[in-house]
Amino acid sequence: MFVDKTLMITGGTGSFGNAVLSRFLKSGIINDIKEIRIFSRDEKKQEDMRIALNNPKLKFYIGDVRNYKSIDEAMHGVDYVFHAAALKQVPTCEFYPMEAINTNVLGAENVLSAAINNKVTKVIVLSTDKAVYPINAMGLSKALMEKLAIAKARMRSPGETVLCVTRYGNVMASRGSVIPLFINQIKQGKVLTITEPSMTRFLMSLVDSVDLVLYAFEHGHQGDIFVQKSPASTIEVLAKALQDIFDSKNEIRFIGTRHGEKHYESLVSSEEMAKADDLRDYYRIPMDGRDLNYAKYFVEGEKKVALLEDYTSHNTKRLNLEEVKELLLTLDYVQEELKNA
């Protein structure tokens, strides 16, 4: 599906960029691709990636999604875009909400506009469960990013740039996530700091995140949102699973929720569930293609939203301690940390 095509990954030196490039390299897909452009701000991370992967198909572009000119110029000749650049740390965005807006909203506007201007065939925008019923600045900014993508999708004519969204749950062992934090605390003999023991989070692997984006790329139509069904765990069970894996007796301390944290996350709202397609492993939420003349649609009717539940980390499959341990042991990151323990 990428034969002789040029692909751009914004924020390409991050967790997702590394995961998708690893997939392409191991599977041989990269041999079919004309070029992959890594667009990001950090020259050191780009240099590290260039040396580590050492592949002539990879081209590196220094730039910032906040700067329209830099993203527009880098996108000349691009066929497909995976937009992963974002500020994603919830507490940080709470303290610096304008920075979240500048990157996650205005930056996304720049990426989408540049893609349309350069006649890119398809853009996959990476979002988060925190965009559903958002209570924090990061989630609000990502929700607006989704709205931008859908609004622009609604205005596209057949044959123009296709814009799709993917929503992630918690991506295990991604940069800045709780699993690396717990493992570091365990290995350093420190107290494990748990915010709220009964708090639940979806558990997705980086492999799952790549699967979701590639599924959306292959099957997505204009304005679609895709969600992967994922199991969940409480934070306490996750911490205890890591203790067992690393044979740790570290003390656990409950420190209370951080700024902007929710007790549980939602991947699909009840309103979206009313129109979502169940695709076995995924939900597809089609774009609401109506215009502002609602009267002509009234006779069509719709499902009663009040009768539907949103899809949350509380009502999805809940993993017990042994199941969480089994899942964690499938992660390359955990295996590497065990070797170095």
From Swiss-Prot:
Its EC number is 5.1.3.2. Pfam families: Polysacc_syn_2C, Polysacc_synt_2. GO terms for biological process: lipopolysaccharide biosynthetic process. It is an enzyme of class 5 (isomerase). InterPro entries: CapD_C, NAD(P)-bd_dom_sf, Polysac_CapD-like, Polysaccharide_Synthase-Rel. The keyword Isomerase applies. It catalyses: UDP-alpha-D-glucose = UDP-alpha-D-galactose. Keywords: Isomerase, Lipopolysaccharide biosynthesis. Epimerizes UDP-galactose to UDP-glucose. Belongs to the polysaccharide synthase family. This is UDP-glucose 4-epimerase.
